[in-house]
Protein backbone atom coordinates (compact mmCIF):
# COMPACT_ATOMS: atom_id res chain seq x y z
CA UNK A 1 0.00 0.00 0.00
CA UNK A 2 1.45 3.39 -0.88
CA UNK A 3 2.20 6.17 1.59
CA UNK A 4 -0.68 8.44 0.45
CA UNK A 5 -3.24 5.70 1.07
CA UNK A 6 -1.75 4.91 4.49
CA UNK A 7 -1.79 8.61 5.42
CA UNK A 8 -5.46 8.76 4.43
CA UNK A 9 -6.26 5.70 6.54
CA UNK A 10 -4.51 7.17 9.59
CA UNK A 11 -6.09 10.60 9.11
CA UNK A 12 -9.66 9.30 8.78
CA UNK A 13 -9.76 6.46 11.32
CA UNK A 14 -8.82 5.71 14.91
CA UNK A 15 -6.39 2.90 15.69
CA UNK A 16 -7.62 -0.38 17.11
CA UNK A 17 -6.56 -0.75 20.74
CA UNK A 18 -6.67 -3.73 23.07
CA UNK A 19 -9.81 -3.96 25.19
CA UNK A 20 -9.97 -3.62 28.97
CA UNK A 21 -10.57 -7.36 29.17
CA UNK A 22 -7.44 -8.07 27.12
CA UNK A 23 -5.31 -5.69 29.20
CA UNK A 24 -6.37 -7.22 32.54
CA UNK A 25 -5.19 -4.09 34.36
CA UNK A 26 -6.93 -5.26 37.53
CA UNK A 27 -4.65 -8.34 37.53
CA UNK A 28 -1.46 -7.21 35.74
CA UNK A 29 1.03 -4.60 37.02
CA UNK A 30 1.19 -1.39 34.98
CA UNK A 31 4.46 0.49 34.47
CA UNK A 32 4.59 4.06 33.11
CA UNK A 33 7.87 5.56 32.02
CA UNK A 34 8.88 9.23 32.37
CA UNK A 35 11.23 8.68 29.40
CA UNK A 36 9.28 7.23 26.44
CA UNK A 37 11.26 4.68 24.44
CA UNK A 38 11.37 4.76 20.59
CA UNK A 39 9.76 1.73 18.95
CA UNK A 40 8.49 0.50 15.62
CA UNK A 41 5.00 -0.97 15.96
CA UNK A 42 2.39 -2.72 13.87
CA UNK A 43 -0.92 -0.91 14.42
CA UNK A 44 -4.35 -1.77 13.03
CA UNK A 45 -6.82 0.73 11.67
CA UNK A 46 -9.77 -1.59 11.19
CA UNK A 47 -8.57 -4.22 8.70
CA UNK A 48 -5.53 -2.17 7.62
CA UNK A 49 -2.18 -2.91 9.29
CA UNK A 50 0.27 0.01 9.38
CA UNK A 51 3.89 -0.01 10.57
CA UNK A 52 4.62 3.16 12.55
CA UNK A 53 7.53 4.72 14.41
CA UNK A 54 6.30 5.71 17.84
CA UNK A 55 7.09 5.97 21.53
CA UNK A 56 6.43 3.32 24.16
CA UNK A 57 4.89 5.11 27.15
CA UNK A 58 3.59 2.28 29.39
CA UNK A 59 3.49 -1.50 29.61
CA UNK A 60 2.20 -4.59 31.36
CA UNK A 61 3.78 -8.06 31.19
CA UNK A 62 1.96 -8.68 27.86
CA UNK A 63 0.94 -5.32 26.38
CA UNK A 64 2.42 -1.91 25.59
CA UNK A 65 0.96 1.57 25.21
CA UNK A 66 2.37 3.38 22.18
CA UNK A 67 1.83 6.90 20.84
CA UNK A 68 2.77 8.17 17.36
CA UNK A 69 2.19 11.11 15.06
CA UNK A 70 -0.15 10.91 12.06
CA UNK A 71 -1.20 13.50 9.46
CA UNK A 72 -4.30 14.10 11.62
CA UNK A 73 -2.46 14.44 14.95
CA UNK A 74 -1.22 12.15 17.70
CA UNK A 75 -2.66 8.64 18.00
CA UNK A 76 -2.34 6.20 20.91
CA UNK A 77 -3.17 2.53 21.34
CA UNK A 78 -2.54 -0.46 23.56
CA UNK A 79 -0.89 -3.26 21.54
CA UNK A 80 0.38 -6.75 22.25
CA UNK A 81 4.05 -6.37 23.15
CA UNK A 82 5.03 -8.73 20.31
CA UNK A 83 3.76 -6.10 17.82
CA UNK A 84 6.62 -3.73 18.74
CA UNK A 85 10.40 -3.63 18.34
CA UNK A 86 12.91 -1.14 19.79
CA UNK A 87 14.29 1.42 17.33
Q: Across the structure, where does each feature detected by a protein language model lie?
A:
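Basic/aromatic-rich interaction segments and small domains that mediate binding to polyanionic partners
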Residues: 3-81
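Intrinsically disordered, low-complexity linker and terminal regions at domain boundaries
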Residues: 83-87
